[in-house]
Amino acid sequence: MISWHELYMVLSAVVPLYVAMMVAYGSVRWWGVLTPEQCSGINRFVAVIAVPLLSFHFISSSDPYAMNLRFVAADTLQKVLVLAALAAWSRFPARFVPPAWPPLDCSITLFSVSTLPNTLVMGIPLLVSMYGPYSGDLMVQIVVLQSIVWYTLLLFLFEFRAARVLIAAQFPDTAASIAAVHVDPDVVSLEGSQAEAHAEVAPDGRLRMVVCRSSVSRRSAAAAATPRASNLTGVEIYSISSSRNATPRGSTFTLADIPGHQPPNSALRASSFGAADLFSLHSSSRQHTPRPSSFDEHAAARARASATVAPTNDLKDTHMIEWSSGASAASEVTGLPVFRSGRETRRLVPSDAPSIASSRVIRPPPGATGGERAASFNKAVGGQDELAKLEAGAKTEQQTTAVTTTTKGGGAAGAERARGQQNAPAGVMLRLILTTVWRRLIRNPNTYASLIGLTWSLIAFRFHITMPIIVAKSISILSDAGLGMAMFSLGLFMATQPKIIACGYSVAAASMGVRFFFGPAIMAAASAAVGIRGTLLRIAIVQAALPQGIVPFVFAKEYNLHATILCTLVIFGMLIALPITLVYYIILGLL
């Protein structure tokens, strides 16, 4: 039977953590003490210094030779059972899997939600207050396994998913022909906004995939650069490294140029483009000034004489955009469009239209931002969807091609065939994923903290040596602050989110059920399977009912996979975790 004194001791150990979290929340939401920039600095300190030192402190002070192998086996078996069940579910025929639930995506999220709790920040103080110091040593063992094994496996799964998406988008028809892979040194992740790929023929004649840093990532690194003027007369064109906040200039293009449309009430600003000015839409060049076009006037005249424009009056249905142009819509500069003002009228026709589609469609290069180039006339046209399609870039176009292939294949069966065509050889995928995972791990301070702490504990408890007092006290001071700062950082995160429940109530309820009921149930079954009974079984179940871990949410947000679900579990789960774990503690104490 749980006494009131024992319940008070549990509350006295856990409530101060919630006080730190609420102080941080109030500092942002109620009192306005901290700005978003200051919150980012605090979170950076917690992630790089406080939490790694907290992990090192707990791991280095725990005796690895007294590890409870049954408890570790139960925790491992729980995760293996969940992975096996998810793997079996992902192998079901496509007709049994809802289209809105991609097996790999849901498997990663369900594994994170059901098996990876917040053991370091919440688990150690809570379990120590409930079951004594011995449970703290057990939690340290879980922390070591999470940091070294399970978070690495989770990162591997995220990178595997990112690699599949990247290859399917860039090589929809030739993925099976890839024989080698090269990853540039500055690429640390295969996530779509950070990496892009292209194919080249190796000296031995085989197809090689080259993964490089995406143009979006390069632009973000050079966003503060000063815009340069183009060498084109009378035309100021900002390079890709220019500020994103540059004010777009007006264009001479108006709705009056489209038959049957009236110009808007608000007049557009005058454009600085002259009647003879040429300008290129090539914005992904790595040079800061646009390259000169090889536009040929005589070739343009011949093109005008032979060109045929498809007659139509239904601009809405055919998604045509008229542009005042006196030149051919095709340029010899990497196949990009070059326009010149004049008396003729050209129409831009989408790629699925017949006849002149290949010579009339604007196809920006990979990485070009459509918002920057279309901002000056996006409102005037009134067809944002059409402009978005024209400005989407090669990456989106290739992704659309993959989706079209799936659609033509006929529903679920077509999706299965498309997935089969997009798969690269296993050796190529493995090398690609291991390269990026290794680069991520060697840049993560928690990896070093866990490995160094485990190494020191193995040496210290084997040869009975102690850490120098100066070093020990320095680490102790920072690690003591790390626990409170970690909760403070959680409060800052809660305050900066627009909603506590960001994924919808039904999804949140299902996720909470998986986190607080399904996970502990699997842990209880795994513990019983390895022969755990008594207090150790109670510790295992309560440990599995802790709130959601933060690292899975960080990965989910970075890889853009169900981030709202993990965000809700971190925020709302932290609020309801204390009463839920107390209920588990009381019920298990009565059994």
Swiss-Prot record:
Listed GO biological process terms: auxin export across the plasma membrane; auxin polar transport; auxin-activated signaling pathway
- Which GO terms fall under molecular function for this chain's record? auxin efflux transmembrane transporter activity; identical protein binding; protein homodimerization activity
The residue spans the entry assigns to the Cytoplasmic side of the membrane are as follows 28-38, 94-107, 159-450, 496-511, 557-568
Which cysteines link up through disulfide bonds? none
Q: Where is this region: Disordered?
A: 243-269, 283-313, 344-374, 392-420
* InterPro entries in UniProt: Auxin_eff_plant (IPR014024), Auxin_Efflux_Carrier (IPR051107), Mem_transp_PIN-like (IPR004776)
Which residues are on the Extracellular side of the membrane? 1-6, 60-70, 129-137, 472-474, 533-535, 590-591
Instruction: List localization entries.
Output: Membrane
Q: Where does (indol-3-yl)acetate bind?
A: 51, 118, 120, 151, 550-551
Q: Where is the composition biased (Polar residues)?
A: 243-254, 283-292
The answer to keyword Membrane applying to this record is: yes
Query: Signal peptide span per the entry?
Result: none
Membrane topology classification: Multi-pass membrane protein
TM spans, by residue? 7-27, 39-59, 71-93, 108-128, 138-158, 451-471, 475-495, 512-532, 536-556, 569-589
- So which tissues is this one expressed in? Expressed in stem bases and leaves.
Q: Pfam families attached here?
A: Mem_trans (PF03547)
Q: Composition bias, kind Low complexity: at what positions?
A: 395-407
The UniProt entry's coiled-coil ranges are none
Q: Give the record's GO CC terms.
A: cell periphery; endoplasmic reticulum; plasma membrane
Any keyword Nucleotide-binding? no
| Keywords of the record | Auxin signaling pathway, Membrane, Transmembrane, Transmembrane helix, Transport
Primary site of residence = membrane
> Its biological function?
May act as a component of the auxin efflux carrier.
The record's section on NCBIfam families has: 2a69
Subunit structure comment from the entry: Homodimer.
Q: What protein does this entry describe?
A: Probable auxin efflux carrier component 3b
The gene coding this protein = PIN3B
